[in-house]
Regions:
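Short, structured "edge-of-domain" segments at secondary-structure transitions
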Residues: 1-195
Length: 195
């Protein structure tokens, strides 16, 4: 063989490799509507299609609905625990609608003594108002709460009997709070610190 023989000449050239385009993981998942169902005992499932949210669903004995909302298989789901941690799930990885689903604690490292405060779809441009029972609160962009591991991301520091209370989507420009003394406090959203 050699360059002088038929078929012997080099057919490729040496060159610097071109840029490889990053393909997001979501591009490999088929986009389909699902209804996310999470019970009070922490059993989660994704039923295909957007079902009516008022529809009666079956649960284990002594269990009932806690979170039922529409999403898509490409969506990331955020779980907020009473320990102040945010956990991330992919809707495509959830068990189907047949049966009762699977325990959420098998998918994320949520301790047994920690409850679920909120479960919602991730919005990269959204913001959340996070607060604890002690009255501490601040605004956090949703881009800052996505966890890359099963252990979640600590956002709100809580100790002892103090637990995380809420993680509401920020809408509007004012916040209204009702205390245990049944008094209402309304203040501007820009008075809250932002993470």
């Amino acid at each position: 063989f050699g360059k002088d023989y038929a078929g012997g000449a080099r057919r490729t050239a040496f060159a610097i490799a071109g840029e490889v385009e990053d393909v997001p993981l979501e591009a490999m998942i088929e986009r389909e509507p699902v209804t996310i169902v999470c019970s009070k005992m922490g059993w989660i499932r994704a039923m295909s299609g957007h079902l009516m949210l008022e529809k009666a669903l079956k649960y284990k004995d002594g269990d009932d609905a806690q979170f039922v909302f529409h999403a898509e298989t490409t969506d990331k789901l955020i779980v907020f625990g009473t320990n102040g941690r945010f956990y991330t799930l992919v809707a495509d990885n959830l068990p189907g609608g047949r049966g009762m689903g699977e325990p959420l604690r098998l998918m994320i490292d949520l301790p047994n003594d920690v409850g679920i405060v909120d479960l919602f779809t991730y919005d990269p441009k959204g913001k959340r108002l996070v607060a604890s029972m002690a009255g501490d609160g601040f605004i956090v962009p949703e881009a800052e709460i996505v966890a890359q591991t099963r252990t979640g991301r600590q956002v709100l520091n809580v100790k002892g009997d103090i637990k995380a209370l809420l993680a509401h989507r920020v809408i509007g420009d004012h916040v209204a709070c009702v205390g245990e003394n049944r008094k209402v406090l309304v203040f501007a959203l820009n008075e809250l610190p932002e993470m």
